[in-house]
């Protein structure tokens, strides 16, 4: 089990020989207009073009700082598969990503990448990419179950009883990626 943090919420996880990239954001600015919106303080520690082959991308929700259009399109062009919460597939289709390259999951639904089981689990948050589309897509955390190790990625979340339920169903976890702030 290995994990490399690339800043903010972007993490590369390697488990059972499978490389998973969580909420990849490699753009300098994540905004519909380049002069507004969240901006990186520091460049990522690796260029997007220097990443190793990624088996799957996991997206927690549709906020601009978690679902980066430019990064997503680049990875999709490389043939990368995406696991996303319900509703986010509409963005991927709009960005010309083939439906065969992604799966949308509801809370408690899962799929496998190799021998690794990925479960879309609850989070206490909200969604939306503008002032006019709040809560039209699902937000999530993710439980990642390998043959011997387990990872929990919280996504953006507040504390709630969902942590106990996730831990009861899928824990204990060997690595927890908890978003703070």
At which residue positions do the language-model features occur?
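A short helix->loop->beta-strand "cap" motif at the edges of active sites that frequently abuts
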Residues: 77-80
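Structural motif
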Residues: 18-20, 56, 116, 149-151, ...
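Active-site-proximal loop/helix segments of hydrolase catalytic cores
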Residues: 70, 125-181
């Amino acid at each position: 089990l290995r994990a490399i943090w690339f800043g903010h919420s972007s993490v590369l996880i390697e488990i059972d020989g499978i490389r998973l990239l969580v909420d990849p954001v490699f753009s300098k600015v994540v905004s519909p207009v380049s002069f507004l919106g969240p901006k990186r303080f520091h460049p990522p520690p690796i260029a997007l073009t220097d990443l190793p082959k990624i088996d799957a991308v996991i997206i927690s929700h549709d906020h601009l700082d978690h679902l980066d259009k430019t990064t997503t399109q680049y990875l999709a062009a490389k043939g990368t598969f995406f696991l996303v919460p319900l509703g986010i597939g509409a963005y991927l289709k709009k960005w010309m990503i083939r439906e065969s390259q992604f799966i949308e999951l509801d809370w408690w639904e899962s799929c496998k990448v190799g021998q690794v089981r990925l479960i879309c689990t609850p989070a206490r948050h909200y969604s939306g990419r503008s002032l006019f589309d709040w809560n039209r897509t699902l937000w999530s955390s993710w439980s990642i179950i390998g043959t011997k190790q387990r990872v929990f990625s919280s996504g953006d979340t507040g504390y709630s009883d969902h942590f106990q339920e996730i831990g009861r169903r899928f824990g204990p976890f060997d690595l927890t990626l908890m978003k703070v702030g």
